[in-house]
Structures are given as C-alpha cells and as structure tokens.
Amino acid sequence: MVNVFFKQQKFVIKKRFNDFNGFDIEENEVLWFELINPTPNELATLSQEYAIHYNTDHSQRVSSVTKYWEDSSSVTINAFFTNQDENETFHMEMATFILSNNILFTIYYGTLEIFDSIQKKVLASPKKFEDGFDILTKIFEVYFEKGVECLEWINKQTSLLRKNIIFKETSTHDDILVRLSNLQEFNVALRDSFFDKRRIITALLRSNKVDSDTKNNLNIILTDFSSLVESTTVNLNSLDNIQNLFASQVNVEQNKIIKLFTVATMAMMPPTLIGTIYGMNFKFMPELEWQYGYLFALIVMAISTILPVIYFKKKGWL
C-alpha cells in the first residue's frame, strides 16, 4: 500500500494507492511517499521510476552497522522506533527513509504508530511542510515527544515498583523480577533508539543537501535527544538501585528462614536428648517404674523446648 502526500495550493492532500498503477500526480508536487508492507513489484517500480535503491533483505538492513549514507542524488536512513503492540508490549521496529529530489520515501513493515501522528500533523499544518526534509524533521520531533512520554511512564512504574518492594505489597517475587526486567529492557531499548537518532541527526547536519533552516531545527532536536539519553542513564541507575534493594530484601527473608530452622533445630535438641535417655535399655531406671514417669518426661521435654525459644527472643534472634 502506498500513501502519497502532495501539495495542492495551500493544502497537503493525502491519497492512497494499492500500487503505483494509476498514479497521476506531478513529481514536483509530491512531499512524501509512505510505503507500508510494500510488495517486490512496488519496490521495483519505485527503483525504476525514481532511481531509488532499496535493500529488500530485511535481515541485512537490521544487522547493518551503517544507518546513514548518501550519494550524489539521495540520502538513505535506517532508524529504529519503539512500538506498542495489542498486548501493550513495547518493542523496536525499523523504518527506512530515503530522500531524493526533496521527496521523502518511507518504507516499513507492520504498524508504526508514530506515522499516524505525523500524518495528522502534516495534514493539519500544511504551511510548515515544503519538502521531504521538513517532514523528516517533524518525524524526529514527534519521536522526541513520544520518548518523553515513554520515560515518564518508566519513571512512574519505577516508583510503583520501589513502593511495592519497600512496603511488601501483594506482588510475588517472580512478578517483581518480571516487571523489573521489562523496565530495564525497555529503558535500554529507548536509550539505543535515542543514540540512533543522535547519530542520524549529526550526519544530516554535515550534509550539504540540508538547508540552513532545517539544520537549525535539527540542532535543537539533537539537544533534546541528548537530554533524553541522560534521562535513560538516570533511569538505569534507579532500576539498578531497585534491583539491589530487592536482592537485599530477598537475602533478609532467606536469613529469617534459616534462622527459624536453626532455632527450631536447637529447640528440639533437648527433648530429643531426654527421649533418647529414656529409650536406653538400662535395667535400673527408677522413672520407668514410676506411675507419673511418662507425664514427667513429657513436661521436661516441653520445658526444654520452651526455654531455648525464650532465650532466643531475649537475645533478639527471633
């Protein structure tokens, strides 16, 4: 599927095509081609009509170290974005941006919610968008705003998790570990994504294809992403502190359990000794002939069990 955004007088118009067949818009009017789950035929047409090369091997694009490169006619960018699925699970998705003749081509598979936000802004404020570089700049701005929202969510979840651990609320240890691990992974993914955007923007600032006004906006966005990277570092430290706090709490609980079993063992040793004595097969044991000998032995066992417990409590070991 192809979404095309083009200028028409003072407005930006969006048209949707199933492929490039029937496409009748003048090239100088087009701002943005958005290709969603493109077929090989669509990519071949794109390459033929607009002299754009796109690597169709997804695994090579993902594993490629080069996220930005340009030649005499175009700029190509591979960037990662956080995305939320139906189960409210965050993960990273990659999108490719190609800028050629001031037209932006975006190619991605699946669903990226950031592009829905971009479309609304482009259609609502057409005067702000004169070429593909303006749209790309706005994509970075919107992603910065999304990043701020994600970091605020992490901060909130981190605070709740800390309270859960300190006040020993209903969550089990397994639940706490899962939540902590998810927050750490999401924060690291955001951090990598922000680093990714900083590298891309820095490369764009060096390009002679970008005009001065766009570079001024990119400089501001670059500073914004640097602040987000610092925030992710703070979050990492907070999550590490929570992990240490949780580990300390688990150690304390384990020590209590060990202490309890130690006390129980010590408390049972005297009555066991007493029972062992009366289990000896000596011929002369007066208590065996005594009418209340059995009751006497039970009382002595009970007293010998209680006395160590009282002693341990006075010592503060229980």
Swiss-Prot record:
Catalytic activity from the UniProt record: Mg(2+)(in) = Mg(2+)(out)
InterPro entries, per database record: CorA_cytoplasmic_dom (IPR045861), CorA_MIT (IPR050829), CorA_TM1_TM2 (IPR045863), Mg/Co-transport_prot_CorA (IPR004488), MgTranspt_CorA/ZnTranspt_ZntB (IPR002523)
Stated membrane topology is:
Multi-pass membrane protein
Q: Name one GO cellular component term.
A: plasma membrane
GO MF entry, a single one = magnesium ion transmembrane transporter activity
**Listed SUPFAM superfamilies:** CorA soluble domain-like, Magnesium transport protein CorA, transmembrane region
Q: Does the keyword Transmembrane helix apply?
A: yes
Site positions per UniProt: Essential for ion permeation: 255
Q: Name one Pfam family in it.
A: CorA
Intervals of motif Probable selectivity filter: 279-281
Q: Does the keyword Transmembrane helix apply?
A: yes
Q: Where in the cell is it found?
A: Cell inner membrane
Could you tell me the keywords of this UniProt record? Cell inner membrane, Cell membrane, Ion transport, Magnesium, Membrane, Transmembrane, Transmembrane helix, Transport
Which PANTHER family does this entry report, sorted A to Z?
A: MAGNESIUM TRANSPORT PROTEIN CORA (PTHR47685:SF1)
Indicate the quaternary assembly: Homopentamer. In the absence of Mg(2+), interactions between subunits are weakened, and dimers, trimers and tetramers can be observed in vitro.
For this chain, the family text in UniProt reads: Belongs to the CorA metal ion transporter (MIT) (TC 1.A.35) family.
Q: What is known of its domains?
A: The central ion permeation pathway is formed by the first transmembrane domain from each of the five subunits. Mg(2+) binding strengthens interactions between subunits and leads to the formation of a symmetrical homopentamer surrounding a closed ion permeation pathway. Low Mg(2+) concentrations trigger both a conformation change within each subunit and a loosening of the interactions between subunits. This results in an open ion conduction pathway. In addition, this results in a less symmetrical shape of the whole complex.
User: In UniProt terms, what function does this protein have?
Assistant: Mediates influx of magnesium ions. Alternates between open and closed states. Activated by low cytoplasmic Mg(2+) levels. Inactive when cytoplasmic Mg(2+) levels are high.
Q: What is this protein called?
A: Magnesium transport protein CorA
Task: Record the organism.
Answer: Helicobacter pylori (strain J99 / ATCC 700824) (Campylobacter pylori J99)
Name of the encoding gene: corA
